[in-house]
C-alpha cells in the first residue's frame, strides 16, 4: 500500500501535466477514460458484487441502490464523462481586462485550483464524475471513497488511469487513497500544501467533521433538508405532481423533498389526496409507501406517526416525509429558515406576489416556484455532471460545475513601468 504522504507527493509532482494541458489534450484524455471505463465493465461489476455482498444487511435498501452498479449504470457513467468533453474549457478564459493611465494592461484570467481532494461515501458514480470534472478544469484529484464502495471505486480508478496511460497526461493526476480508515480522512483535512481545496460529499456527519477539522480550504456540499410549501393559492393537481416527483423519484439523493408544508386552507382537500397517492396507490402498485411524520394539525386529515421535533431537522434519504400545516406564507418561510440546510426549497402557488415573497425571503442555493426540487443538479442546470451542491456562499453556491473548480490570477503586462 502506498502511503498517503507518498500519494500527496506523487500528485504534486505531476499536477503540471494537467494544470497547463490544452483543451484538446484534456478532451482526448476524457474520451480515453470513458472508453476504458466501459471496457472494464466486467471487472467493475465483479468488484461491485463484493461490495454489495459485504454491505447487505448493514445499510438500507435505498443506500444499497446507491452502491449498486450494472452495465447500464457504467455506460451512463461513461456517457457523463463524454458529456464533459462537450463543455467549454474554463481554463484561460479572460474574465476582465483593463488598462491603467500608466499603460499597464491588467488581465484577470481563469486558472486551475491545482490539486483537489474529495472525500465521499458509497456512490461509485462520484468517482467518474469527480475525475472528469477535475481533469477538464485542469486539476489533479485525490479521491477518498467510503469503505462500503472501496472495491468498486478501486476498479473504476484503475480503468480511468489505464485510459490516461494512452495519453500525454500522467495517470498519477488521479489518486485513490487506499486507506479507508478515519485517519485517512483527517490526513486529507490537514494536507495543507498538498491539497488546494477539499470537497466532502456525504451525510451530515462527514460534512461537519470536514468543516470543523480541515485546515485546507473547504467547499461544503451540505445535506438537503428540502422543503416544498403548498400555498393557499396553489393548483392542487400541480402540487401533487411536484410532491410525488420531489419525494419518490429518488428519495436517497440530496435534492429530494424531506418536509412538506401545507397552508391550512389547503390541508383538508390536499392531504387526503396525498395519502391516496403516496400510500394507497403505491401499495397497490407494489411500491414502497411513504411513511408520514405528522404534526398535530396534519394528523387531523391523514394517518401516520406523530412527528418528533427532530423529524423536521432530518435528512431521511428514504420513503419518509415530515408534514406540517401552517397558517400563513410567512409561517412557512419562518419554518424553512429555522430548519433549512439552504439547499433547495420550493413553493407551489398561482399567486405571483406569494412567489416573489418566497424567492426573496428563502435563503437557499436553489429556490423553486411551481417545480420539483429534483432539478437541483448540474446536468439539469446545463453544467454537465457536478461535483456536488454547495450550500455555502463563498466561492461557489448551488451545483458545482467546471467554473466552480477554478480560481483566477492577474496577468499584468507593461513596457518598463516602475512605481514612483
Curated annotation (Swiss-Prot):
Its main location: cytoplasm. InterPro entries: Ald_DH/histidinol_DH (IPR016161), Ald_DH_C (IPR016163), Ald_DH_N (IPR016162), Aldehyde_DH_dom (IPR015590), G-glutamylP_reductase_CS (IPR020593), Glu-5-SA_DH (IPR012134), GPR_dom (IPR000965). One of its GO terms (molecular function) is glutamate-5-semialdehyde dehydrogenase activity. The keyword NADP applies. It catalyses: L-glutamate 5-semialdehyde + phosphate + NADP(+) = L-glutamyl 5-phosphate + NADPH + H(+). GO terms for biological process: L-proline biosynthetic process. One of its GO terms (cellular component) is cytoplasm. It is found in: Cytoplasm. Its EC number is 1.2.1.41. Keywords: Amino-acid biosynthesis, Cytoplasm, NADP, Oxidoreductase, Proline biosynthesis. The keyword Nucleus does not apply. Catalyzes the NADPH-dependent reduction of L-glutamate 5-phosphate into L-glutamate 5-semialdehyde and phosphate. The product spontaneously undergoes cyclization to form 1-pyrroline-5-carboxylate. This is Gamma-glutamyl phosphate reductase. It comes from Streptococcus pneumoniae (strain Hungary19A-6).
Amino acid at each position: 500500500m502506498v502511503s498517503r504522504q507518498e500519494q500527496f507527493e506523487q500528485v504534486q509532482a505531476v499536477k503540471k501535466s494537467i494544470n497547463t494541458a490544452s483543451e484538446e489534450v484534456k478532451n482526448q484524455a476524457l474520451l480515453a477514460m470513458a472508453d476504458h471505463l466501459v471496457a472494464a465493465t466486467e471487472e467493475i461489476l465483479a468488484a461491485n458484487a463484493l461490495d454489495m455482498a459485504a454491505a447487505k444487511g448493514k445499510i438500507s435498501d435505498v443506500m444499497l441502490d446507491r452502491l449498486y452498479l450494472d452495465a447500464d449504470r457504467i455506460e451512463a457513467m461513461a456517457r457523463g464523462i463524454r458529456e464533459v468533453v462537450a463543455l467549454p474549457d474554463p481554463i484561460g478564459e479572460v474574465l476582465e481586462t483593463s488598462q491603467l493611465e500608466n499603460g499597464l494592461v491588467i488581465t484577470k484570467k481563469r486558472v486551475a485550483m491545482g490539486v483537489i481532494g474529495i472525500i465521499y461515501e458509497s456512490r461509485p458514480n462520484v468517482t467518474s464524475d469527480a475525475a472528469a470534472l477535475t481533469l477538464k478544469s485542469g486539476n489533479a484529484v485525490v479521491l477518498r471513497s467510503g469503505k462500503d464502495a472501496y472495491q468498486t471505486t478501486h476498479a473504476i480508478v484503475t480503468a480511468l488511469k489505464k485510459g490516461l496511460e494512452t495519453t500525454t497526461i500522467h495517470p498519477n493526476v488521479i489518486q485513490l487513497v487506499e486507506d479507508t480508515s478515519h485517519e485517512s480522512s483527517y490526513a486529507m483535512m490537514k494536507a495543507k500544501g498538498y491539497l488546494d481545496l477539499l470537497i466532502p460529499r456525504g451525510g451530515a456527519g462527514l460534512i461537519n467533521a470536514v468543516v470543523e477539522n480541515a485546515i485546507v480550504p473547504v467547499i461544503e456540499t451540505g445535506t438537503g433538508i428540502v422543503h416544498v410549501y403548498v400555498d393557499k393559492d396553489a393548483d392542487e393537481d400541480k402540487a401533487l405532481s411536484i410532491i410525488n416527483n420531489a419525494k419518490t423519484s429518488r428519495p436517497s439523493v440530496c435534492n429530494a423533498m424531506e418536509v412538506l408544508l401545507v397552508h391550512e386552507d389547503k390541508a383538508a382537500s390536499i392531504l387526503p389526496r396525498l395519502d391516496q397517492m403516496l400510500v394507497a396507490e403505491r401499495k397497490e402498485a407494489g411500491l414502497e409507501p411513504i411513511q408520514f411524520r405528522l404534526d398535530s394539525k396534519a394528523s387531523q386529515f391523514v394517518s401516520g406517526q406523530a412527528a418528533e421535533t427532530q423529524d423536521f431537522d432530518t435528512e431521511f434519504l428514504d420513503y419518509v416525509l415530515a408534514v406540517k400545516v401552517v397558517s400563513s406564507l410567512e409561517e412557512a418561510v419562518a419554518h424553512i429558515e429555522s430548519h433549512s440546510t439552504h439547499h433547495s426549497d420550493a413553493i407551489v402557488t398561482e399567486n405571483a406576489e406569494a412567489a416573489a415573497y418566497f424567492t426573496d425571503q428563502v435563503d437557499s442555493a436553489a429556490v423553486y416556484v411551481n417545480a420539483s426540487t429534483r432539478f437541483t443538479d448540474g446536468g439539469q442546470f446545463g453544467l454537465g455532471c457536478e461535483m456536488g451542491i454547495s450550500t455555502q456562499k463563498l466561492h461557489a453556491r448551488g451545483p458545482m460545475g467546471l467554473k466552480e473548480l477554478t480560481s483566477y490570477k492577474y496577468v499584468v503586462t507593461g513596457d518598463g513601468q516602475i512605481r514612483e
